[in-house]
Amino acid sequence: MDQPFAAFPESEHRERLSRAREKIREAGLAGCICVAPENIYYLIGYDSIAYFNYQALIISAEEDSEPALVIRNVDLPLVKETSWIEDVRTYHLHASDIAKMVADVAREKGLREGRIGIDLQSYALPGAYALPLVKALEPMQVEDATELLGSLQYIK
């Protein structure tokens, strides 16, 4: 994709994703669903202005699995301008079952059983999104990955 407003090259984001996958595996998780805009930006460069709408970056712990992004349909042009990610799924606000969509994409990425991390402490994850998402992900066990995902950005 052409990303005229990307802050970093794709190679930098792929390195970040690789480090994220390493931490995900170390934590014994099958993958993660990132909902916090700051984590999504850090990992794929998508600079969301719609942080108040549901979004999700689905990452498998497996290195050969490409991440997928679920966003509102009207936000797609901004993804194309700021990120290299190609697997982007869109939903229509108030018309789509977003939690089911995110869970279905997670299953497509091989996340069907075991433990999955979500940045549960994010302001971008209100109860109206969190509760149906946890239910839709069953039988997977949801774990709080807020610290795991946030720690990727620490400067040592």
Where are these regions (language model features)?
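Short active-site-adjacent helix-start/loop capping segments
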Residues: Y41-I44, A50-F52, S65-A68, L76-K80, ...
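Compact, glycine/acidic-enriched structural inserts
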Residues: E66-A95
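Short, solvent-exposed amphipathic alpha-helical segments in soluble enzyme
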Residues: S48-A50, I85-E86, P132-K135
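Conserved acidic residues
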Residues: A30, E86, G114
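Short internal beta-strands
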Residues: A56-A61, P67-R72, G117-I118
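Structural motif
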Residues: P37, R72-N73, I118-Y123
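Terminal domain-start leader segments
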Residues: M1-E62
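Flexible, acidic/His-enriched mid-domain "rim/lid" segments that flank
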Residues: D2, K23, A61, S96-K156
